[in-house]
């Protein structure tokens, strides 16, 4: 997968290209991340990349000319078929379904805003989609872009060590993940659930699904409203709810 990034702070993306899962993906040639800095497309000695907004008001906007030239360079490098995304609080909120959709693209160009944002005409002429990571304001689009890259890269074949890992993540099936345990078997008097030590994979899978359903019901009940649960899942959820009521009543 190829991802181009337009950012005034390209060095921030070393966190993606040199570390962790995405860093290994870059090293093995599964993920290619290239950055363009609008400052490289300025022609004054101060490398100015901000400008005042028409109509006045606080703050500055990213200067149009350097930003557009950087986007054009990224498009030229990408060739045909690259989707251009602007990270913006006004965009579609990123969720697991959105990540899956974005992962079907072989090429993405992510535009990271700074200051008060970018000229609306640049959005109209250069941007295909706007995406947000949540209803809050950040200093720029770099962190949202890194979140998007990390989430999307997990669906690139070969990036994760186990092919099923991405499918079993929280939200992959619309549910929160089940609890996980590793050694020691007993920690501060708390034992690993016996079913996980049984070796019976059918029982283990049933327990995990019950915990996933129950955890979603407890923490994010609105997620269940949009799911068509199977008969088995309904039974498991009812079991969890009954067990939870018994524990809280003790």
Swiss-Prot record:
Keyword Methyltransferase on entry: yes
Any one Gene Ontology molecular-function term assigned to this protein's record: tRNA (guanine(37)-N1)-methyltransferase activity
Binding of S-adenosyl-L-methionine, residues: 113, 133-138
Compartments in which it is found: Cytoplasm
GO cellular component labels: cytosol
Location (main, coarse): cytoplasm
Pfam families reported in the protein's UniProt record: tRNA_m1G_MT
The enzyme's E.C. designation: 2.1.1.228
Catalytic activity: guanosine(37) in tRNA + S-adenosyl-L-methionine = N(1)-methylguanosine(37) in tRNA + S-adenosyl-L-homocysteine + H(+)
Protein keywords: Cytoplasm, Methyltransferase, S-adenosyl-L-methionine, Transferase, tRNA processing
GO BP terms, alphabetized: tRNA N1-guanine methylation
Assembly: Homodimer.
Similarity field: Belongs to the RNA methyltransferase TrmD family.
Physiological role: Specifically methylates guanosine-37 in various tRNAs.
Protein name: tRNA (guanine-N(1)-)-methyltransferase
Organism: Proteus mirabilis (strain HI4320)
Recorded name of the encoding gene: trmD
